């Protein structure tokens, strides 16, 4: 059949060529899938503009956008890194409980709603970031605020209440300045 003998190289190859100086240097996130999933909506809330720029660059350079979009990708990484660092500073206990629950439950969000509600409350109060599902119809209860989960292994305790951030006009990703008691 073939005239040459197949040769398999089992060594890992590293490309040691440095990136050009025009590409900004950035440290990687250093987080596994569970912490990233736990913080994903908050990363999306704060880093939306960077994500949109990156996706626009990828769409404008189909099939060859890897090198052209490195700058935008580095901005996304830097922003996500800042969100993870801020959550670790402000809400470490709640964050750790939530991502550990995700890790223990095969990354199934519905198994960890009570821990998620506590994390959402802490992040909103300390960082002003809200968990919002994009394109959610206004007349439908978001899945993360439902008190009854169909596929959950155990029922949500009656004492657990979902955190619903106060509604406000304008920018939905900022914490309210001061709660005024008008009623």
UniProtKB/Swiss-Prot annotation:
Motif Cx9C motif 4 boundaries: 112-122
Gene Ontology process terms (BP): mitochondrial electron transport, NADH to ubiquinone
Cofactor(s) recorded in Swiss-Prot or TrEMBL: iron-sulfur cluster
Domain of life: Eukaryota
Cellular component annotations (GO), alphabetically ordered: mitochondrial inner membrane; respiratory chain complex I
Region (Disordered): 161-183
Residue numbers covered by motif Cx9C motif 2: 69-79
Alphabetized PROSITE patterns for the sequence: CHCH
Pfam family, one: CHCH
Compartments (UniProt record): Mitochondrion inner membrane
Cofactor comment text: Binds 1 iron-sulfur cluster.
Domain CHCH: start-end pairs: 44-87, 88-130
Positions of disulphide bridges: 47-79, 57-69, 91-122, 101-112
Motif (Cx9C motif 3): 91-101
Motif position, Cx9C motif 1: 47-57
Swiss-Prot/TrEMBL keywords: Disulfide bond, Electron transport, Membrane, Mitochondrion, Mitochondrion inner membrane, Repeat, Respiratory chain, Transport
Function: Accessory subunit of the mitochondrial membrane respiratory chain NADH dehydrogenase (Complex I), that is believed not to be involved in catalysis. Complex I functions in the transfer of electrons from NADH to the respiratory chain. The immediate electron acceptor for the enzyme is believed to be ubiquinone.
PANTHER family: NADH DEHYDROGENASE [UBIQUINONE] 1 ALPHA SUBCOMPLEX SUBUNIT 8, NADH-UBIQUINONE OXIDOREDUCTASE
Family: Belongs to the complex I NDUFA8 subunit family.
The protein's assembly and partners: Complex I is composed of about 40 different subunits. This is a component of the hydrophobic fraction.
Official protein name in the record: NADH-ubiquinone oxidoreductase 20.8 kDa subunit
């Amino acid at each position: 059949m073939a005239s040459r003998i197949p040769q398999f190289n089992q060594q890992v190859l590293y490309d040691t060529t440095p990136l050009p100086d025009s590409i900004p240097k950035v440290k990687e996130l250093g987080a596994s899938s569970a912490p990233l999933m736990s913080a994903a909506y908050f990363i999306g809330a704060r880093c939306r503009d960077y994500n949109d720029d990156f996706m626009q660059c990828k769409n404008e350079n189909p099939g060859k956008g890897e090198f052209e979009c490195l700058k935008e990708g580095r901005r996304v990484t830097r922003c996500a890194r800042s969100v993870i660092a801020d959550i670790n500073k402000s809400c470490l206990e709640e964050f750790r409980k939530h991502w550990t629950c995700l890790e223990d439950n095969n990354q199934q969000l519905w198994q960890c709603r009570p821990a998620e509600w506590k994390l959402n409350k802490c992040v909103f109060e300390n960082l002003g970031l809200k968990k919002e599902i994009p394109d959610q119809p206004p007349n439908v209860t978001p899945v993360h605020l439902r008190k009854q989960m169909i596929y959950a292994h155990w029922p949500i305790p009656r004492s657990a209440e979902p955190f619903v951030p106060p509604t406000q006009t304008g920018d939905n990703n900022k914490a309210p300045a001061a709660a005024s008691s008008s009623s």
